[in-house]
Regions:
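Soluble periplasmic/extracytoplasmic beta-strand elements of cell-envelope proteins
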Residues: 83-86, 103, 205, 272-274, ...
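Sec-dependent bacterial lipoprotein signal peptides
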Residues: 1-22
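Detector for small/aliphatic-rich hydrophobic stretches
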Residues: 16, 24-169, 174, 401, ...
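C-terminal, non-catalytic macromolecule-binding modules
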Residues: 291-294, 325
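C-terminal soluble interaction/assembly domains
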Residues: 353-418
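Short, surface-exposed, charged loop/turn segments at secondary-structure junctions
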Residues: 286-290
Length: 418
């Protein structure tokens, strides 16, 4: 059966893992009434753009590995996180900038190259496929009276098409406006990305929002969906609505997994589903995935007659990415070593949180997905006096400081009477 034929459908239980996602809207049709297939980009990619896409993919799988926890589902937008942090990089300097570039996978690329590629990627993804509803938006919100360097604002406006605004963060209307912007950008799917009461030390929010919606090129028949067991990692099962589809689809398999690529609309966007083989856990797959392995998978699909059984699901997910980014080497930005001297003349700035909220709905008709990432910048007050409260077991050393000679060493686990 060819992919252009109407697939027939039936039901059988199967468990699956969603790994890669893109979505679109109601597909336009050509003279024959069919969706017009998109087979090439509107222009060739430059060498730098290819490097940035490769870097973005490396970051995607690095983030997947650091964020993944055994037996826990997750749904992230690496692109949203990358764009929010990419804006923030324009205010960073020195080792802070170097670490951010490395964590995001950009290697030796210059800031000009990175910014230009973000700009072209925005232009490419939005409107690539007329059947795809894709929205990507960026914004920067600063506290009223906080001095922001003009060069930074120019960079985020030009390269990220960012909306820029100065607000009185002490006014409750400020958080309502920021959250309203995110709500609008994600079609109501992401709410309350910043708290109702903005902390007094916050001076800036840098936000990216992404929204996708679309229909499958080959839709599942809702009447064929039945409740079936989904086999959990611990050996138990839960009942889920299992959709079914049979037809020619991009498929590949090896000794570790099966993969099927489900296209949307004009087939420029797709969702890849990876199913571990028996004896291989989904966490094993996560640990083995990197950009090179992904390229091998993505390049290895062949049109094959496939019987697919996929759970219908909807989930919301929220994660603070601080620890994940630190694990990728981005440490200075979060503490007193942070250098954001290209963002403001005020010193003592650091990132207090990188937070992402996401949402996805996969059903018989297609997929809707949204994510928003916020980078929260704070202004550190005067250094706090260190507190040393010796109220638990401790060590002590008596020494002669000038020569370095140690006279006594001791360990106290329960102080004897004085």
């Amino acid at each position: 059966m060819g992919a252009s034929a109407s697939p027939h459908r039936f039901v059988s239980p199967l468990s699956a893992v969603l790994l890669a996602l893109a979505a679109c809207g109601d597909p336009p049709t050509g003279p024959s009434g069919r969706v017009e297939e998109i087979t090439e980009l509107p222009r060739g990619l430059s060498a730098t753009e290819i490097q940035v896409i490769d870097a973005s993919n490396r970051f995607a799988f690095d983030l997947l590995k650091t964020a993944s926890r055994p037996d826990s589902s997750l749904f992230l937008s690496p692109l949203s996180a990358s764009m929010a942090l990419g804006m923030t990089m324009n205010g960073a300097a020195g080792e802070t900038w170097d670490q951010m570039r490395e964590a995001l996978g950009f290697g030796s690329l210059s800031e000009a190259e990175i910014n230009a590629s973000y700009q072209s990627l925005l232009e490419l993804l939005v409107g690539l496929d007329p059947s795809v509803e894709t929205a990507i938006a960026n914004s920067v919100w600063s506290r009223q009276g906080f001095p922001v360097l003009t060069a930074f604002l120019d960079a985020v406006r030009e390269s990220f098409d960012a909306e820029v605004a100065e607000l009185d963060f002490a006014n409750p209307d400020a958080s309502a406006r920021i959250n309203g912007w995110v709500d609008d950008a994600t079609r109501g799917r992401i709410e309350d990305i910043v708290p109702e009461v903005i902390p007094a030390d916050v001076v800036m929010y840098l936000i990216n929002a992404i929204y996708f919606k679309g229909t499958w090129t080959f839709q599942f028949d809702r009447s064929d969906t039945t409740n079936e067991p989904f086999h959990l990692s611990n050996g138990s099962t839960q009942t889920v609505p299992l959709m079914t589809l049979q037809g020619d689809l991009p498929y590949r398999a090896d000794d570790r997994s099966q993969a099927v690529d489900l296209p949307y609309g004009g087939r420029a966007f797709s969702m890849t589903v990876l199913l571990p083989r028996d004896g291989v856990s989904v966490d094993d797959l996560v640990s083995s995935l990197d950009a090179e392995r992904w390229a091998e998978i993505a390049d290895g699909f062949h049109e094959t007659e496939v019987e697919l059984f996929l759970p219908r699901f909807r989930m919301a997910y929220e994660r603070t990415l601080n620890d994940d980014l630190k694990a990728l080497g981005m440490t200075h930005a979060f503490d007193e070593r942070a250098d954001f001297s290209r963002l403001s003349t005020n010193g003592g700035l650091s990132i207090s949180a990188v937070k992402q909220k996401s949402w996805v709905d996969v059903n018989e008709e297609g997929t809707e997905a949204a994510a928003a990432t916020v980078v929260e910048i704070i202004e550190t007050s005067l250094p706090q006096i260190p507190v040393v409260r010796v109220d638990r077991p401790f060590l002590f050393v008596i020494r002669e400081r000038l020569s370095g000679t140690i006279l006594f060493v001791g360990k106290i686990v329960a102080p004897p009477g004085a």
